[in-house]
Regions:
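Single conserved hydrophobic/aromatic residue that forms the stacking wall/gate
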Residues: 214-225
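N-terminal structural segment of carbohydrate-active enzymes
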Residues: 2-110, 120-123
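Acidic-residue sensor for enzyme active/binding pockets
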Residues: 23, 183, 218
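Substrate-binding cleft and catalytic face of glycoside hydrolase catalytic domains
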Residues: 50, 78-213
Length: 225
C-alpha cells in the first residue's frame, strides 16, 4: 500500500527574484551604484565577475541588463497582483543595499528606498503573500568596493550590521522571515559579484577569497542583531 504524502498546512508556495534581476531604476530616488549594475553581457563578463578585470562604472560599448531589468521598481504593484492571481503564498526577494544606503557607509539611510520596500511588503500582504527577504543577493554598494575593497575588509561587518538593524527596525511586523546572504559559495567562483572583490596582478586570490568568506559568513553564524 502506497502511503499518501501531503504538504503540511501553511506550507509556503511561491516564487523568487533578486533585486538586481528585476528592479532596474539603478539611479532612481537616491539609489547608489552597486557592483551588480556594472556587470555587462558579453565576452568581458566572465573576467569582470571573477574580479580579474576592473569595471567600477558604466563604459561605452557595453550592455548592462541590471540598469533597467524588468523595471519592477515602477511596476511592482502589477507584478504582485499577478503573483496573487497565481496563488503565491510567499515571495522571496532581496534588498538592493545601495537603495537603502547609497554608498554603504552612511550613518542614516535613504528614506525613499525604505519607503519603496515598505510599500512593496504591504502590497504582498494585501494578496496574502508572505515576504521572505534575502538581505544581500550578489549586491554591494560600489563605494564599499572602491573605498574599502569589498568583503576582504572586516569593516564591512559594521556596515552590514547597520543595514540589518535598519531593515529589522523599519519592517518589524511586515517581514517575518529573513535570510542573510544568497550563495556565499559564489565568492569562490564569481568573487566580484559575491563579495565585491577585485584582484591586483600577482595577488594571492585564494587567500583573499577565503579571508572574505570568513568575514561574510560571520553574520550567518551569529548575527548580533
Amino acid at each position: 500500500m502506497t502511503k499518501k504524502m501531503t504538504f503540511p498546512d501553511g506550507f509556503l508556495w511561491g516564487g523568487a527574484t533578486a533585486a538586481n534581476q528585476c528592479e532596474g531604476a539603478f539611479d532612481a530616488d537616491g539609489r547608489g551604484l552597486a557592483n551588480v549594475d556594472v556587470v555587462p553581457i558579453g565576452e568581458d563578463r566572465l573576467s569582470i565577475i571573477t574580479g580579474r578585470r576592473k569595471m567600477f562604472d558604466f563604459e561605452d560599448g557595453y550592455f548592462y541588463p541590471a540598469k533597467e531589468s524588468i523595471d519592477m521598481y515602477h511596476r511592482y504593484k502589477e507584478d504582485i497582483a499577478l503573483f496573487g492571481e497565481m496563488g503565491f503564498k510567499t515571495y522571496r526577494l532581496s534588498i538592493a543595499w545601495s537603495r537603502i544606503f547609497p554608498k554603504g557607509d552612511e550613518a542614516e539611510p535613504n528614506e525613499a528606498g525604505l519607503a519603496f520596500y515598505e510599500d512593496l511588503f504591504k502590497e504582498c500582504h494585501k494578496y496574502g503573500i508572505e515576504p521572505l527577504v534575502t538581505i544581500t543577493h550578489f549586491d554591494c554598494p560600489m563605494h564599499l568596493i572602491t573605498e574599502y575593497g569589498g568583503w576582504r575588509n572586516r569593516k564591512m561587518l559594521g556596515f552590514y550590521e547597520n543595514l540589518c538593524r535598519t531593515l529589522f527596525t523599519r519592517y518589524k511586523g511586515l517581514v517575518k522571515y529573513w535570510l542573510t546572504f544568497n550563495e556565499i559559495n559564489m565568492i569562490l567562483h564569481a568573487p566580484f559579484m559575491g563579495a565585491g572583490l577585485c584582484f591586483e596582478e600577482g595577488e594571492n586570490e585564494e587567500q583573499v577569497k577565503y579571508l572574505s568568506l570568513i568575514h561574510i559568513s560571520e553574520p550567518t553564524r551569529h548575527l548580533r542583531i
